[in-house]
Every structure is written in C-alpha cells, then in structure tokens.
C-alpha cells in the first residue's frame, strides 16, 4: 500500500467531498508523496509540532485537526517548519475533521456512547446538514457515568449533578455546547461535551439536566482509536496512537 492508496481508502470511508462546503479544515491528504510506501501509521488528535516529532519514523499520520484550515493558507513561519519537517521525514499527513465527527461508525460521540455502555443511539446536533452528536438510552446513574469517564480522564473540566437518575444522554464531542438546546428537545437527563460553556449552565439548572464537560481533547480521541484498532485488524499495517492530552 502507498500513500495514494491509503488516502483514497480514507476518502471513501469518510466521504470527505461531502463536507467541503461546511468544514474549515482541509480534509484529506494535506502533505505527502503519493507514491511512498506505507507500513507504519500513527494516529493523533492534533498535528502539533510535538506530535509530528513523535510520529517521526512512521510513514503516515492521521489526525483529527490538521495543519491547513483553508485552501488559501500561506506556508510561512510555523507552517513552513511543520511542512518542511513532514517532507524531510517522508511523513504523510492526512486530516479528517467533520467527516469523522458525523460518521456512523467512527464518530467520536458514537464511540464514546458505546464506551459508556449506552444503547439505542440516534444522531442529532445538526450542522450544515450533517449530525455531529448522539443521543442514547442509559441504565446507569449520573455518578456511575461520571466515575467511568474519570477512570479514563482525570482532567474533566466541569461536572454538575442536578439529579442522580439518567435515562437519556446527549453527547457531542469537542466544542458541542451550542447543541444543548437541541438536546433539550429530546428530554435528555445528561449532556456531555468537551468544552465548557457558562451560557448553558442556567438552562441546565432550570431544566434539571446534568452536565459533564469532559475536555475537548479527550472527547475527540474515541473515533481515532477505533479507526486505529480496525486498521490493525483489517490492514497489514503497524499502528500507533500518539497521546498529547492538553487537559482541555
């Protein structure tokens, strides 16, 4: 398999062309020699310079947040340094942002809900015609759900319990607080997202909806890790997840 083959495979899985009109991220192959062989693939949330350095020695890096966020970015300053590093180390960079958020299998929100043991999930959180979140049924209490998350991530930004019983949960990974009012329409008992938001606290209190702001980084690891695990099983590739938790 070469860079072109793997890029085409990912383009097909995530149907990236569908998102050109709504996603600021430049989805797909951002940097790479399309004819280079791929044996080792790394996965990471962000294409920070520290991530690129740790990915050195791999042939292909898949990130949720790439280095190009428009089709007109200039390759200067730190962008020049990152691009130069990728080229000099023959490391291809592939980014998949909203196409992963909205994916039926690899959505961070969907995989997160599976991790929590939630059932009967359906998509919500409409953004530009695609759904970025999940609503699912719960048989667990608020305390049980919070404890399960804390076992994986000690740096939960904020949580607030208004009631212990949780029958329905809404999850939107990353910065999903703007979908809180849509979640209210589904009578959820718990709303989970990454980033904190002062503006939804009063609404949550008034409607008795529990809140967990579990961290932007943490909530956007789930789909990547599932994709990595599937690649390890389905493809003859060596895989690695690069953890650079910002605790935010």
Curated annotation (Swiss-Prot):
A divalent metal cation 1 binds at residues 64, 101, 220. GO terms for cellular component: cytoplasm. Pfam families: DUF34_NIF3 (PF01784). InterPro entries: DUF34/NIF3, DUF34/NIF3_sf. SUPFAM superfamilies: NIF3 (NGG1p interacting factor 3)-like. Transmembrane segments: none annotated. A divalent metal cation 2 binds at residues 65, 216, 220. Homohexamer. This is GTP cyclohydrolase 1 type 2 homolog. Keywords: Metal-binding. Belongs to the GTP cyclohydrolase I type 2/NIF3 family. GO terms for molecular function: metal ion binding.
């Amino acid at each position: 398999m070469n860079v072109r083959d793997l890029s085409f495979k990912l383009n097909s899985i995530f149907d990236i062309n569908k998102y050109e009109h709504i996603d600021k991220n430049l989805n797909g192959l951002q940097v790479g020699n399309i004819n280079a062989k791929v044996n080792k693939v790394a996965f990471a949330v962000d294409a920070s310079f520290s991530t690129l350095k740790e990915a050195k020695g791999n042939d292909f890096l898949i990130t949720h947040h790439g280095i190009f966020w428009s089709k007109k970015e200039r390759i200067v300053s730190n962008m020049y340094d990152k691009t130069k590093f990728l080229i000099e180390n023959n490391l291809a960079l592939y980014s998949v942002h909203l196409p992963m958020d909205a994916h039926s299998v690899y959505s961070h929100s969907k995989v997160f809900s599976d991790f929590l043991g939630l059932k009967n999930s359906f998509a919500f959180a409409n953004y530009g015609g695609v759904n970025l979140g999940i609503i699912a049924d719960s048989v667990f209490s608020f305390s049980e759900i919070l404890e399960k998350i804390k076992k994986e991530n000690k740096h939960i930004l904020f949580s607030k319990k208004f009631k212990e019983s949780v029958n329905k949960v809404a999850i939107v990974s990353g910065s999903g607080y703007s979908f809180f009012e849509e979640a209210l329409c589904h009578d959820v008992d718990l709303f989970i997202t990454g980033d904190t938001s002062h503006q939804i606290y009063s609404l949550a209190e008034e409607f008795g909806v529990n809140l967990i702001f579990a961290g932007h980084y943490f909530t956007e690891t789930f789909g990547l890790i599932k994709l990595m695990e599937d690649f390890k099983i389905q493809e003859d590739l060596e895989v690695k997840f690069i953890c650079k938790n910002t605790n935010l």
